[in-house]
Amino acid sequence: MTALNQLTLTEAREGLATGEFTAVELTQSYLDAMAEARTLNAYVLETADKALAMAAESDKRIASGDAGKLEGLPIGVKDMFCTDGVRTTAGSKILGDFVPPYESTVTSQLWRDGAVMLGKLNNDEFAMGSSNETSAQGPVVSPWRREGDSAPLVPGGSSGGSAAAVAAFLCAGATGTDTGGSIRQPAAFTGTVGIKPTYGRCSRFGIIAYASSLDQAGPFARTVNDAAVLLRSMAGYDPKDSTSVNRSVPDYEDAVGASIKGKRIGIPREYRVEGLDPEIAGMWEEGAQWLRDAGAEVVDISLPHTKYALPTYYIVAPAEASSNLARYDGVRYGTRVPGRDIIDMYERTRAAGFGPEVRRRIMIGTYVLSAGYYDAYYVKAQKVRTLIKRDFDDVFAQGVDAVLTPATPSPAFGIGEKGSADPVEMYLQDIFTVTVNLAGLPGISVPAGLSCKNLPLGLQLIGRPFEEETLFSLAQVVEEAAGRFPVDDLWWK
C-alpha cells in the first residue's frame, strides 16, 4: 500500500471520504515525514500540535457529514502569508519572531474549507530570489539530485520550500506567491505543478508585499487535478484587497480532462533564446506535438517586446519593493540595532536586518524612483510593460487560446552555483516567466520530462485573463502524455 503521505491530494480526499483512514492518521504520516526530512530545510516552523488539533476537528466534521472541500487535507504555507498566532518572517531577520494578529484571506479560505496546517515553508527573503538561497533561515535543499552526483541542488525560488515540500511528500499541497516566476520556476525544478492565477483572482490581503502590482498567490501540488482543487479554495473576491476582482470562481476540477479539440496554441518565436538548453528545446517541441495529438491547433506567434521583459521587470519590481519595504524600521518588532538617534537606529536596523539581495533591490528601486532618473527608468519601464501586455492582447485577439513556452531555461542548478559573482546570472532564470506577471495573466508550470541527468523539466502554459480553466485542460493533456515524475530516491531519510 502507498504510504499515506505519498497519496495525491485527490487520492487522500477520496480515502478520507470513504473512511479508509482518518485525518489524524494522514496528518501524522506527514508530520513523521517532516521529522525525517529536516535536512531539506523546507519548513521554517512546524505546527504539529495545531495540525493534529485541526485534523481531529476535520474527523468530527467528516463523521457528521459536514466535510468541507479540503476537509482533513494537510498543507504547508509559504512564510509570506500571515497566519494568526503563528510566526511569520518572510524569510528575513528584520521581521524576527513576528507573530501576526490576523490571518491572510487565502489561508483563511483554506482553513474554512477544512485544510490542515502543517507549518510555515521556507522562501527567499521577502520573495526576492530564484533559488531559495537568500532566506535568513538558510537555503532549501531540493529533494532531487543529479544522477550519480550527491551535490545539493536548489529547488528554485522564491517559493522553494513549498516546491520541495510537495515534491518530497512533506505536504499534500502548498501555497506559494509568484511575482516574476516564484511558483512556476520552482515547480519546474522539482517536478511539481504550480499555477500563478490571473492578477486579482486571489486576494493579496495578509500576504507580505514584495511588488504589489505583480504579486499573486497560487498553489503547488503533485498533479494538475490537485492544483485545480486547491485553487478553487484559494481564489475569490475580497473587499479587503482593492485589486481583487469580483468574479465568480468556477469549479476548476471540472476543467481537468475537458477536451482541448479546436484550441489554438501559440508558440512565440521570441522565446527561442540563445543558450536555451537543447533538452528543453526538444521537450518544448514534444509538448506542442502532444497538444496537436489531442486536437489542438499549434501556430507560430510573435510577442515582439519579450526581449525587454527582464529589464522592465527589474525596474518595476525593485521600485515597488523599495516602497513596500520602507515600513520596516525595527520600532515595533523584529531586528532592532541601537543608534545615536532614531534616524541612526533606522539605518543600522535596516542594514543589519535585510540580506544582501534585498538591500540590492531596495537600492535599485530607490535609484530608479529618484528625481533624476524617474522618467528615464521607471516611467519608461511602465510604458514598455503596457507594450508587453498589448503583445498578448493582440495574440489573443487573433484567436489564440493559450501560449506554450518552456518554464525555465535550464534544469535545477547546484547551491552556490549561480549569481555570486554576477546577480544578472540569477535574474536570467526568470526569462520565460516575468512577462506573465507584467501582463497580469495566468500561467501554469507542468512537469514534462527529465533531463539526461534525471532532473525534472517543466513546460509553461500562459492563458487569457481569468481563463485558468483552459490552462488546467491543456496541462492535463501534458500530464497524461508525459506521465508524472515523483522523487524516487528519498535519500534524506
UniProtKB/Swiss-Prot annotation:
Q: Which PROSITE patterns match?
A: AMIDASES
Among InterPro entries, the record links this protein to: Amidase (IPR000120), Amidase_CS (IPR020556), Amidase_dom (IPR023631), AS_sf (IPR036928), GatA (IPR004412)
Q: Which residues form the active site?
A: 78 (charge relay system), 158 (charge relay system), 182 (acyl-ester intermediate)
Keywords from the UniProt entry: ATP-binding, Ligase, Nucleotide-binding, Protein biosynthesis
The record describes its quaternary structure and partners as: Heterotrimer of A, B and C subunits.
Family, per the entry?
Belongs to the amidase family. GatA subfamily.
Concerning PANTHER family, the annotation shows: GLUTAMYL-TRNA(GLN) AMIDOTRANSFERASE SUBUNIT A, TRANSAMIDASE
Protein name per Swiss-Prot or TrEMBL: Glutamyl-tRNA(Gln) amidotransferase subunit A
